[in-house]
């Protein structure tokens, strides 16, 4: 009978990059982690002194057991249990990286070091975006099921003197987008605005 130590979810070593390529990252997480498609993760590479960002694209159950059908056995839970050898395998697409020294953002043309720490970003991690964004707010940054409240998504007013379309199916947030967008445009007072909302 196997006795496995239960996962210490507070141990950051459980969230670590295990590989793939410069085009696709893979990391593991405890089996009971609440992860979602579209969630943005921060990958801290202390070897290269950079912070990578990636968006989750797939989640699957995985284990370290040699028996690939261990979880279909009648007494699987009794013999194997859910511990540190059972985990979630997470696939993610790279978004880019920021140099910790200078703060410059780069396209993902390199790969994080193996076993780099994977964590949730906070508003401060996205501070580099404030230099890249404009002054017209259109909403807040989303990460999976959550909103990163400290990170407003803004577009530069210089690109607005032209026609713009907002297209989506019902319930996708068009009206909310237009509400925030119009309020931000009125606050800036740099141009006129005509909104057509056909039904």
Task: Pin down the residues of each PLM region.
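P-loop NTP-binding catalytic core
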Residues: 100-158, 163
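Long, basic/Gly/Ser/Thr-rich N-terminal segments
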Residues: 1-128
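Glycine-rich phosphate-binding loop of nucleotide-binding enzymes
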Residues: 137-199
């Amino acid at each position: 009978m196997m006795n496995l130590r239960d996962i210490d979810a507070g141990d950051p070593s459980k969230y670590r990059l295990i590989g793939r390529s410069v085009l696709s990252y893979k990391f593991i997480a405890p089996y009971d982690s609440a992860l979602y498609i579209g969630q943005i993760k921060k990958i801290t590479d202390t070897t290269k002194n950079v912070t990578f960002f990636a968006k989750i694209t797939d989640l699957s159950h995985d284990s370290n057991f040699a028996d690939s059908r261990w979880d279909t056995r009648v007494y699987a839970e009794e013999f194997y249990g859910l511990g540190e050898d059972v985990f979630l395998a997470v696939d993610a697409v790279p978004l880019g990286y920021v140099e910790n020294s200078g703060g410059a953002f780069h396209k993902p043309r390199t790969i994080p070091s193996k076993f780099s720490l994977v964590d949730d970003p906070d508003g401060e991690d996205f501070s580099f975006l404030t230099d890249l964004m404009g002054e017209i707010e259109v909403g807040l940054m989303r990460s999976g099921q959550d909103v990163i409240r400290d990170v407003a998504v803004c577009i530069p007013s210089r690109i607005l003197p032209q026609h713009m379309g907002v297209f989506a199916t019902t319930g996708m947030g068009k009206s909310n987008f237009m509400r925030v967008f119009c309020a931000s445009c009125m606050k800036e007072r740099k141009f006129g605005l005509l909104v057509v909302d056909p039904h």
